[in-house]
């Protein structure tokens, strides 16, 4: 309904993931080392609002009501991508609803410069998803945002979080490989294929 992955249902490994019985080596993260350049959208930070479809607004308001009733915190995030002006205005509309209910709304499309995102290099599929280098930049930005606005307990070194430390060690090794691959693809002008 919101972000479909229905084609993945053909993979037996995904059925184990759905029931949370299969541990993922990177805690759900998938490395993308492709490069699919896209011009930087000129609508990041644009003003104005456009209403979202009524059924989506109803779902958003239901979620906000649930969070309020349960006394839960929530952070609504839009990751950077090759958005249109219409989409930016819809995010502005959603942001007003979310913040009016007392929750934070972080639209990373308003922070390209602070993130350091380079649309010609940091996307895997022509503006929809970041590659590993772009994801690292977004993660660094999000980390700083979270540390500025929330309080966390450092759980590194605790036995219960050992699997996270192991995943992070694996991630660091894979990330180095991805950086080299991405830089090589950019240098050679080898870009991702568009699959219809």
Regions found by a protein language model. Give the residues of each.
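Short, local alpha-helical segments
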Residues: 44-47, 78-80, 119-128
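N-terminal start-of-chain detector that recognizes signal peptides
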Residues: 46-48, 76-78, 98, 153
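C-terminal regions of proteins
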Residues: 86-170, 178-192
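Secreted/periplasmic serine-hydrolase-like ester/acetyl group-modifying domain
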Residues: 1-70, 157-196
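Functionally constrained cores in energy, signaling, and assembly domains
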Residues: 28, 72-75, 124-125, 130
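Acidic-and-aromatic substrate-binding clefts and catalytic sites of carbohydrate-active enzymes
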Residues: 51-56, 82-89
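Alpha-helical context
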Residues: 36-43, 74, 111-114, 118, ...
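Active-site segments of SGNH/GDSL-like serine hydrolases
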Residues: 61-87
């Amino acid at each position: 309904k919101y972000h479909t992955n229905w084609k993945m249902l053909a993979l037996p490994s995904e059925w184990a993931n759905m029931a949370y019985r299969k541990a993922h080596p990177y805690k759900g993260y998938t490395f993308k080392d492709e490069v699919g350049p896209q011009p930087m959208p000129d609508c990041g930070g644009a003003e104005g609002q456009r209403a979202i479809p009524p059924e989506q607004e109803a779902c958003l308001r239901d979620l906000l009501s649930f969070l309020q009733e349960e006394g839960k915190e929530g952070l609504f995030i839009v990751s950077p991508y090759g958005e249109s002006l219409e989409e930016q205005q819809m995010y502005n509309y959603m942001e007003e609803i979310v913040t009016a209910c007392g929750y934070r709304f972080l639209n990373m499309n308003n922070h390209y410069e602070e993130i350091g995102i380079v649309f010609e290099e940091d996307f895997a599929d022509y503006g929809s998803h970041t590659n590993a280098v772009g994801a690292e930049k977004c993660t660094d930005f999000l980390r700083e945002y979270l540390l500025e606005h929330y309080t966390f307990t450092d759980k590194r070194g605790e036995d219960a979080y050992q699997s996270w430390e192991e995943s992070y060690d694996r991630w660091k090794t894979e990330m180095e490989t991805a950086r080299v691959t991405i830089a090589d693809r950019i240098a050679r002008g080898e870009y991702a294929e568009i699959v219809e």
